[in-house]
Amino acid sequence: MIQKLSEKQYFIIDFDSTFTQVEGLDELASIALANQPNREETVQQIRSLTDQGMNGEIPFSSALKQRIALLNANVTHLESLVSFLQTKVSDSFVRNEAFLRAYASQILIVSSGFKEFITPVATALGIREENIFANTFVFDENGTIIGVDEKNVLAQDGGKVKLVRAMQLDAHVSVIGDGYTDYELKKEGLANRF
């Protein structure tokens, strides 16, 4: 039985290393670079940039651009990534799928990850597509990832704060996440709980 919420509230959930047990971009790198001789070194560079950006050690936008430049991934790699991520959804979200579906209008995914791999994984557990806020890739004519949509607020430094502030959520807000960018929502007074 699903417990009824006592008040109107929103749950803002990060995707990478929260909704799933892994970092999507890091795993995409492992898939895309599988046959490359410098795979481990490049994947480690991407992981290091991910950690530095999440911890606020370097500007997020800089970390994102550097990671994308190292990827060399395409749409086929994204399909493989989605299949992999579907096996890596965190147990707590799998166990609480009924809650996710019952309160779908109040659950938001706010991620610096990418819609191309977040949407198919999150919607399978009841998250509404219109409640998924994430970056989007830019592709060339061959389907190779060549960048990110830099106009998307989540591709910018402080993107989560800017996005949630613009939402003007008039309710109790709980943030579920693992990184500094998630904590910033609480720090800036946009969340009641972190």
Can you name each region flagged by the protein language model?
Residues E129-V161:
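Glycine/Thr-rich beta-alpha phosphate-binding loop at enzyme active sites
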Residues A155-Y183:
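Conserved Lys-Pro-Asp/Glu-containing loop-to-beta segment of HAD-superfamily phosphomonoesterases
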